[in-house]
Structure formats: C-alpha cells, structure tokens
C-alpha cells in the first residue's frame, strides 16, 4: 500500500502535470473555472493549497486574485522544487498534510485541496483531518462519492505511476460536514459532491 502512496514522489509525473497545466491555461478545464468562481464569491486574503503538485493554482491566484497570499504544500519534494523553479515563487513547502495543525491553519482563510484525498487509500481519514483543522472555508475538488461503502481502485496517472482513486460514501461525507459545523456554500457541478466550496 505504501508503494502507491509514495509513487507521487516522482519528478517525471509532475513535469507531465506541469506540461498539461500550461496548455490548459489557454482554455481552463471546468474545475479551474469552479475555483475562480468560488474565490470570486468570498473575501479571503490567505489561501493554503494542500497537495499543490506543480503549483498551477498559484498562477490562477496571481492572475485572478493578486491580493490573495498563496502558500502551497506538498509531500513530494519533486513537486515543490519544480513549482518553485517554474513559477519563480518561494511560497511552496514540503509538508505532509498530516503535519498541519489548527495553529498553522489559523494563518489562512481558506484551505484548498484538489486531487489529494482522492489519490489516497484512506480518503475518508484525510477528509476528516481537513474538517478537524476547522478552516473558515474549504474548496474540495474531485471529491468523488458513492452510495455504497467508501472504496478505492488503482489506476495509472499521467501514464507514469500507479495510484489510488478514492470514492467516499456520500452519507458519511454529509455526516462529517455536519459534525464539523460546515455547510455546502457552492456546488455548481450539480452533483452530490464532486467540487465544493464549504464554509463554517
């Protein structure tokens, strides 16, 4: 199991991610459109991007929300070094999401996590962890759900690495939000979850 978790510590996969993202900057994919729309609806000054990968959300913030202070963290040094070099920005740090604390989160208005909880074998645990941090807002991307028990499958990302694709039990997601005193503020995808802005 740990082999797949560590598979993202791979320079080549983040180079492919960056190449894909740079092409997408000419015509935004839907989840980027959602991100820009969500951020336009709220007043925030400090954003923490968990699982930042090659760091393209920094560029989205710079272009659309230049007053927002962006910080990106990723457990993969390969991702962080690439992001720092390409975007010429020092606000990327090597950090596992499990190292985050409530005290650290107090410095941010909003937590952004896209393609993190869904590439873990324990996505429910990760979602619970984010909620327990109690940020004021959270943007949760690619929050895939199922009516059955939470589960995952294995797939190949960027034709490079084997990784997980996690599906959360929808009732458990709703329960976790309720227990954490969060409400779904925006869900433009019109799905039970998928891409959400939640707030306290």
Regions of interest found by a model, annotated:
Residues 88-99:
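Conserved SAM-binding strand-loop segment of SAM-dependent methyltransferases
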Residues 76:
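Conserved SAM/SAH-binding beta-strand->alpha-helix loop
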Residues 135-146:
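Conserved beta-strand signature within the Rossmann-like core of class I S-adenosyl-L-methionine
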Residues 83:
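Conserved SAM-binding loop
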Residues 155-171:
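Acceptor-substrate binding/catalytic loop of class I
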Residues 1-39:
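Conserved class I S-adenosyl-L-methionine
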Residues 54-65:
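Conserved SAM-binding loop of SAM-dependent methyltransferases across substrates and taxa
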Residues 110-122:
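A short SAM/SAH-binding and catalytic strip from SAM-dependent methyltransferases
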């Amino acid at each position: 199991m740990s082999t797949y978790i560590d598979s993202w510590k791979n320079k080549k996969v983040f180079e492919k991610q960056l190449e894909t993202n740079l092409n997408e900057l000419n015509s935004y994919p839907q989840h980027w459109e959602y991100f820009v729309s969500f951020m336009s609806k709220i007043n925030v000054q400090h954003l923490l991007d968990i699982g930042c990968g090659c760091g393209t959300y920094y560029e989205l913030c710079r272009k659309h929300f230049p007053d927002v202070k962006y910080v990106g963290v990723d457990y993969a040094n390969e991702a962080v070094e690439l992001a720092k070099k390409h975007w010429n920005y020092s606000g990327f740090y090597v950090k596992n999401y499990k190292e985050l604390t409530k005290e650290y989160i107090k410095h941010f208005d909003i937590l952004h996590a896209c393609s993190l909880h869904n590439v873990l074998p324990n996505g429910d645990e990760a979602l619970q962890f984010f909620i327990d941090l109690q940020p004021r807002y959270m943007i949760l991307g690619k929050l895939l759900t199922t009516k059955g028990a939470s589960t995952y499958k294995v797939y190949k990302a960027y034709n490079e690495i084997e990784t997980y694709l996690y599906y959360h039990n929808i009732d458990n997601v709703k329960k976790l939000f309720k227990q954490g005193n969060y409400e779904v503020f925006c869900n433009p995808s019109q799905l039970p979850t998928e891409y959400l802005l939640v707030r306290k």
